[in-house]
Swiss-Prot record:
The gene is ATP1B1. Residues 191-303 are annotated as: immunoglobulin-like. InterPro entries: Na/K_ATPase_sub_beta, Na/K_ATPase_sub_beta_sf. Belongs to the X(+)/potassium ATPases subunit beta family. It holds the Pfam family Na_K-ATPase. The C-terminal lobe folds into an immunoglobulin-like domain and mediates cell adhesion properties. The sodium/potassium-transporting ATPase is composed of a catalytic alpha subunit, an auxiliary non-catalytic beta subunit and an additional regulatory subunit. Interacts with catalytic subunit ATP12A. Interacts with regulatory subunit FXYD1. Interacts with regulatory subunit FXYD3. Interacts with NKAIN1, NKAIN2 and NKAIN4. Interacts with MLC1. Part of a complex containing MLC1, TRPV4, AQP4 and HEPACAM. Interacts with KIRREL3. Interacts with OBSCN (via protein kinase domain 1). Interacts with TRAF3 and TRAF6. Residues 63-303 are extracellular. It is a single-pass type II membrane protein. The keyword Magnesium does not apply. The chain crosses the membrane at residues 35-62. Glycans are attached at N158, N193, N265. This is Sodium/potassium-transporting ATPase subunit beta-1.
Length: 303
């Protein structure tokens, strides 16, 4: 039995290294070299084919604009202050209750300060009234970075923070800033004037994508009170000269036009659900995405 075990042990040792034939694991050095060379060439060819395929694919893709945008959803509408539960609840006589909302607005508006828009090589004045879409050439690097329209805080009126650093929260008249999310190459198409007849409070311009905030439910409509809008030229919406957006590579300092909304006499101690909605021929809404073209926010001013 001991002899059989020794014989078995000697056989696997001989398989690992056969000193008589100079073989390692059943192959000579030359055989190992040939098989390793084969696999190096084989996997090298596979890697070359893969890299070549990627290079060909990259030649068809622009780093400045997606080749296909037919499935890109319409832009979303969002509010500032940006809050997790889309609920704003505060007491006007308690600064700590609205401190986070004010800080959120201040932080967002930093890039809209005059001091941040001084560079004449980057920023330009695009007028104090809404105007037509401002084309800035093709989506490529032939002309380098594109200029960006300035947006002045003073256009936000009572919600600019210039005269009221609490943005109305101290007086129980909260401000909410509204922006249309960036979509590369998107050109808003405002609705026709006659299609807005159901919304008589909306000031119309063919060069503005209008926005309106109303009570979400019937009971909310009676409690929302007066709503004031502050935007470029006094229009409640987004002026077209700020579009299209050319992307971070061509417009790294791009400023979205803003609309400020102030609720001046909300019913106290009542949770009011408010819906703000953009209107346009190429603005869509989705039940699956509550921010596509609109948003809801709950506001409660406590006594």
């Amino acid at each position: 039995m001991a002899r059989g075990k020794a014989k078995e042990e000697g056989s696997w040792k001989k398989f690992i290294w056969n000193s008589e034939k100079k073989e390692f694991l059943g192959r000579t050095g030359g055989s190992w070299f040939k098989i390793l060379l084969f696999y190096v060439i084989f996997y090298g060819c596979l890697a070359g084919i893969f890299i070549g395929t990627i290079q060909v694919m990259l030649l068809t893709i622009s780093e400045f604009k997606p080749t296909y945008q037919d499935r890109v959803a319409p832009p979303g509408l969002t509010q500032i202050p940006q809050i997790q539960k889309t609920e704003i609840s505060f007491r006007p006589n308690d600064p700590k209750s609205y401190e986070e909302y004010v800080r959120n607005i201040v932080r967002f508006l930093e890039k809209y300060k005059d001091s941040a828009q001084k560079d004449e090589m980057i920023f330009e004045d695009c007028g104090n009234m809404p105007s037509e879409i401002k084309e800035r050439g093709e989506f490529n690097n032939e002309r380098g970075e594109r200029k960006v329209c300035r947006f002045k805080l003073e256009w936000l009126g009572n919600c600019s923070g210039i005269n009221d650093e609490t943005y109305g929260y101290r007086d129980g008249k909260p401000c909410v800033l509204i922006k249309l999310n960036r979509v590369l190459g998107f050109k808003p198409k405002p609705p026709k004037n006659e299609s807005l007849e159901a919304y008589p409070v909306m000031k119309y311009s063919p060069y503005v994508l209008p926005v309106q905030c109303t009570g979400k439910r019937d009971e909310d409509k009676d409690r929302i009170g007066n709503v004031e809008y502050f935007g470029l030229g006094g229009y409640p919406g987004f002026p077209l000269q700020y579009y299209p957006y050319y992307g971070k590579l061509l417009q790294p300092k791009y400023l979205q036009p803003l609309l400020a909304v102030q609720f001046t006499n909300l019913t106290m101690d009542t949770e009011i659900r408010i819906e703000c909605k953009a209107y346009g021929e190429n603005i869509g809404y989705s039940e699956k995405d509550r921010f596509q073209g609109r948003f809801d926010v709950k506001i409660e001013v406590k006594s």
